[in-house]
Structures are given as C-alpha cells and as structure tokens.
C-alpha cells in the first residue's frame, strides 16, 4: 500500500465521530513523506532550517504559496491525474498545475465532505451540473469531483455546459420539466453560471428538498453580485430556500473543500448558527498576517493558509492570496482577495522557493 493510500484509509476511518483523525501525527508523517519525495520542497525547507527532525507540531510545517503550483513540480510521484486552474491570464504556462499521484485520496476527502454538507438527509437526487462533462474538461478538479458525486448520489446525471459555455436554453427546459413533476433536484456549478440563468429571466418553483451548490466563481460576469443578492435570486428564480443554497470553497491546489454550514446546521438542530465555511477534520486553516505571516487574533482579517492532509501526494500546506477571518470555533469567512501587489509574506516565500 502506498503512503497516499494509507492516508486515504485514515481519512475514511475518521469519518465516524468515534474515530477522529490524529491531525498532529498525520501532519508530521505527511511532511516527512513530502520532504523525502519532493526535491524542490525539500530544498526550500532546508534553506529555512526545517526538517522532519526539527518540527514538533502541525503548524511548524512550512507553507508553500499557491502561485508556486504555476512553475514548480510538487508531486511526490508519477501522477494519476493532473488538474489545472482555470485562469487564463498570462497564457497556459501561468495556470496552476496540481499533479495527483493517487486519485482515490482526492475522492476519499471530497465525497464524504460533500455528503455531509449537501446531503445531510441521506437522499439521492437527479444531478444537473452547470459544467462541461469530464470528457471536455479532464483537467478540472471540480468537474472530476462532480462526476464522483453523480456516481455516488445521483439518480441521474446531466452536464449542461459544453465547449461554448452554459446551455441556458437546455437548462431552462430541464428545470421546467422538473418543476412540472415536483421532483427534488441537485444543482451544482459556478456562481456565474447561475447568475447567467437568472439574467435569462428563468423562473421556476423546484420541488421541496431541491438544493444548490455554487462554487463562488464570478469570472465573465458583467456585474458583481453579493452573497445576499445571490441567495435572494435563488429563491426568486428557482424557488430554492436560502438554507438549501450551499456555497463551496475549493482550490485546484487542494484536495479538500469547505462548505457553507447552513444545511448541515439545520439538520443538526442549529438553525441559528452563523453561516460559515466548514471543512473536514483533516483540513485546518490558519489566518495569517500578510506581511509577517504570523497568526492574527480571533476574528481579525488575514491571508488564508490551508493545511490539507489529503494533499499528501504534493504539499500539504498552501498559502493563498485569499483574505478571510475565523467564524465561531470551526469555520471561516472569505472576504475577498489581496488587491495589487503580492503580499510581502508571500513574496518572501516565493523568493526562497526560486532559490531552492
């Protein structure tokens, strides 16, 4: 059994509440594995005086800026799949590249987390994805995940986008058909896709229990939309209550995701809990000062730094340029991205990696 397969087994075992994952132990084991198998990461750590023998806690593991995935090979072995970020600025060479040695490790993280936050009632539903099918987007981690979701939880699966984008007319027709039957449905896709549907004037009342997952991307929109405005539009145009609208926060550079806690909280009898992005036990997020990379105080704004054990096949600690803050004791809120120049802390890490 490969090391990545061991981690996948540990993640699956920790889904049961009685067997929480030992995050510290696994974080150190994952770091030792990556230190041994990713030469660029090992050189970077050695320049900082960090080795498996010099650290004692999970938060001692050095972070790698997400930008590094654009230019450095960070895989622990031959990849079973390679996912790429969707950004096109600067050409294909500027897109992030995440090589995955074991797809089952990504699945072991993604599928139970999706089920926990989107399907807390244990239902199976028709799945309408506002995305191209895997054959058209094999390098999309989101498309890959949705394919697994359809296999695991879908009574049927339809992909409503193609090489020219979202097929709004076809989607509108399918929604009208579902409205007529009263059957509940799962909709999933980028926020921008839903906004295009709303701007088309589509108005239906989908069956009780219908739900929606949006991924937060607004690229290509003529106008920005607030979260509150988006939730209102979901009710106005689809008849989906706000507590059945679940935002997903994910990155190509991570194998784990966070989800809006609203639906899970409702089924757990916590309807008054604040909306926040919550992840699995094997994903931890620190909020760091953009200049010093020191942790900020509770509720203060800083850069999101994710420690994802499901990233065992590449690098587990990824420093983003997303700004956020902690909410309650288990969640975060995204407040946007750093504007303008790269944050000083990120820039220093990028310089060190370039010298490694």
Q: What function would you assign to each model-found segment?
A:
Residues 84-89, 260:
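Hydrophobic alpha-helical segments that mediate membrane insertion or helix-helix packing
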Residues 96-139, 143-160:
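Long, hydrophobic, well-ordered secondary-structure blocks that form the structural core
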Residues 89-92, 252:
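Gly/Ser/Thr-rich beta-alpha loop segments that engage phosphate groups in nucleotides
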